[in-house]
């Protein structure tokens, strides 16, 4: 299957870090497979390509919110958890019954209540919007 999302995720390095994408910005496919085997989870195509493109890029993997390393992925409450905020108030996930969808919808859980709410977008939409918010809106505010 052709890469559907890889180039779009790779393009985030020059857009937000003002540097060319390098292979070390992503995780090698064999390492990703090994870490997913350790976690014991399957992931959607979009998340696989996200890790292949950016899994080694700490500046993006930990840009305000923290993406879980592949070996830390877990299914909880019927969702594959992949992201948390710095205060650990929220966690983001993909419904476990949607992992075969190439680009599934993203949901957010308020940890204090344990309630899930749709983010009204797919993983690729959510991630691209999140990085735009972090680097184009939030970061300039924090610098002032």
State what each model feature region is.
Residues 106-137:
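Compact, glycine/acidic-enriched structural inserts
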């Amino acid at each position: 299957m052709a890469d559907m999302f890889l180039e779009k995720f790779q393009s985030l390095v020059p857009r937000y870090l003002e540097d060319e994408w390098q292979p070390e910005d992503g995780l090698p496919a064999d390492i990703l497979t090994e870490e997913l085997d350790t976690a014991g989870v399957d992931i959607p195509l979009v998340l696989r390509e996200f890790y292949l493109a950016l899994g080694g890029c700490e500046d993006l993997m930990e840009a305000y919110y923290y993406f879980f390393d592949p070996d830390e992925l877990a299914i909880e409450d019927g969702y594959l958890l992949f992201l948390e905020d710095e205060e650990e108030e929220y966690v983001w996930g993909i419904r476990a019954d949607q992992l075969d969808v190439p680009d599934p919808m993203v949901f957010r859980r308020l940890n204090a209540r344990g309630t899930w709410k749709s983010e009204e977008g797919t993983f690729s939409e959510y991630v691209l919007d999140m990085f735009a918010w972090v680097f184009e809106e939030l970061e300039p505010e924090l610098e002032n």
